[in-house]
UniProtKB/Swiss-Prot annotation:
Gene3D superfamilies: 3.10.450.50, Creatinase/methionine aminopeptidase superfamily
CDD domains the UniProt entry points to: MetAP1
Secretion signal, residue range per the UniProt entry: none
Stated name of the protein: Methionine aminopeptidase
NCBIfam families per record: met_pdase_I (TIGR00500), PRK12318.1 (NF008970)
Family of this protein: Belongs to the peptidase M24A family. Methionine aminopeptidase type 1 subfamily.
Enzyme class: hydrolase
Organism listed in the record: Chlamydia pneumoniae (Chlamydophila pneumoniae)
Required co-factors: Co(2+); Zn(2+); Mn(2+); Fe(2+)
Length: 291
């Protein structure tokens, strides 16, 4: 259905003037076909969602154990070695390992201080004052989970505490509004509105994404103000992973490893991520660890 088509409710008005952006009242199978043809978005079945939830819970558990192991003096390579052990323990595959071009060389991303995302583990020990995002993505029984969290090492400067808190609030604010019918752009609006209250910037080079059957699927989820009017619908599963900078929003990708993105002004950056499912009445955070 396009915006200028007659509204599905039978009012005779255009969809954009009537029930837009609410999706048509269809059977689950018809709605799934509509989203596949109109937006190239795969709405997950309850059976698929259950498998994705299992993958997300294992992903969240691995992330939790890695965060607990992140202490002063530990290297991120040691965290990657622990990650390999945990993936074996939970019968999971590390989705980032050898992903992309050039192939990503590790099983997790560890992004410290001014590194926005895709940090590659190395032999440098963690030290007092570091902040670090650990990003874990797992494949379990062929289904994907994806989440990340910030860790603070020892005594951390106030500005770093502030950027970690701001990024978490950006994520939480954007999740709180989720329900069927709202346009995708409201996610970015919520994130940028919260970042504005801190005077921080929102990275626009990297976005959230559909996930579950593949590592990266439609829809792509901008974390900044945008005009995407795709209405959320039950069965959509995607990540929200806002990257928030103290200074300028621009990032620079390392020309040597072609993965690590750093802030252009070397100011700190922070990111938190969850995988979320849209339900009939709202949302479910699939990577919220259920003990």
């Amino acid at each position: 259905m396009k915006r200028n088509d007659p509204c599905w409710c039978g009012s005779g008005r255009k969809w954009k003037q009537c029930h837009y952006p609410q999706p048509p009242k269809m059977s689950p199978e018809a709605l799934k076909q509509h989203y596949a043809s109109q937006y190239n978005i795969l709405l997950k079945t309850p059976e698929q969602k259950a498998k994705i939830y299992n993958a997300c819970q294992i992903t969240a558990r691995i992330l939790d154990e890695l965060c607990k192991a992140s202490q002063k003096g530990v290297t991120t390579n040691e965290l990657d070695e622990l990650s390999q052990e945990l993936h074996k323990k939970y019968d999971a595959i590390a989705a980032p390992f050898h992903y992309g071009s050039p192939p990503f060389p590790k099983t997790i991303c560890t992004s410290l201080n001014e590194v926005i995302c895709h940090g590659i583990p190395n032999d440098i020990p963690l030290k007092d004052g570091d902040i670090m995002n650990i990003d874990v993505s797992c494949i379990v029984d062929g289904y994907y989970g994806d989440c990340s969290r910030m860790v603070m090492i020892g005594e951390v400067p106030e500005i770093k505490k502030k950027i970690c808190q701001a990024a978490l609030e950006c994520l939480n604010d954007s999740i709180a509004i989720l329900k069927p019918g709202i346009p995708l752009c409201e996610i970015g609006e919520a994130i940028e509105a919260r970042a504005d209250t801190y005077g921080f910037s929102v990275v626009d080079q990297f976005v959230g994404h559909g996930v579950g059957i593949e590592f990266h699927e439609n829809p792509y989820v901008p974390h900044y103000r945008n005009r995407s009017m795709i209405p959320l619908a039950p069965g959509m599963i995607f990540t929200i992973e806002p990257m928030i900078n103290v200074g300028k929003k621009e990032g620079v990708v390392d020309p040597k490893n072609q993965w690590e993105a750093r802030t252009c002004d070397n100011q700190p950056s922070a990111q938190w991520e969850h995988t979320i499912a849209i339900t009939e009445t709202g949302y479910e955070i699939l990577t919220l660890l259920n003990d």
